[in-house]
């Protein structure tokens, strides 16, 4: 009898999970950022709260950019931009939505990002350019937690640094008409910032758009980021 109850309970939980997935908003489609983001700012338009050491590094990056020197930026060597920078670039991305997994496929080098739904975020993972991401539905919003980032990428196109302690939380909210997507991101990195902070971005859906092939190695000379 206990075994039967356990089986029925598991089946019920599975059905609830499937029903939740079925009721989740459909984020599928190709998305373009609505407004170009250069320097990432907090939601109130301020410079993020950098530590003294990180501020010095940020200033060094901005000085180099002013001189036309982008050699510090791995993107100029065809390395992946990292997050959340990849979400701030003008090139579009496509969301492929499945019951247990979401995929972000970016035009830039066709970079794929996998978000595992309803899984725990590992505390010890090998570093990746796009980190390791898990997600869950909070009512009609998709909440994504990511860690395990390479520390050689940047947070934006203006040289904002981060460390391997970066923890990124993203909250995606779809508009009622399904054509606009709002992203609220929280950046927590105690090695780089004195406190966690939030930023935001908006995206517009482009029905019928097919993302073209994009291979960085085909660029004759990559001396500076495309954005």
Task: Outline where the language-model segments fall.
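Short helix-onset patch at the extreme N-terminus, typifying the N->h transition
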Residues: 6-8, 29-30
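Positively charged n-region of N-terminal signal peptides that target proteins for export
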Residues: 1-5
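Hydrophobic small-molecule pocket/channel-lining residues, especially in calycin-type beta-barrels
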Residues: 20-227
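Bacterial N-terminal signal peptides
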Residues: 7-19
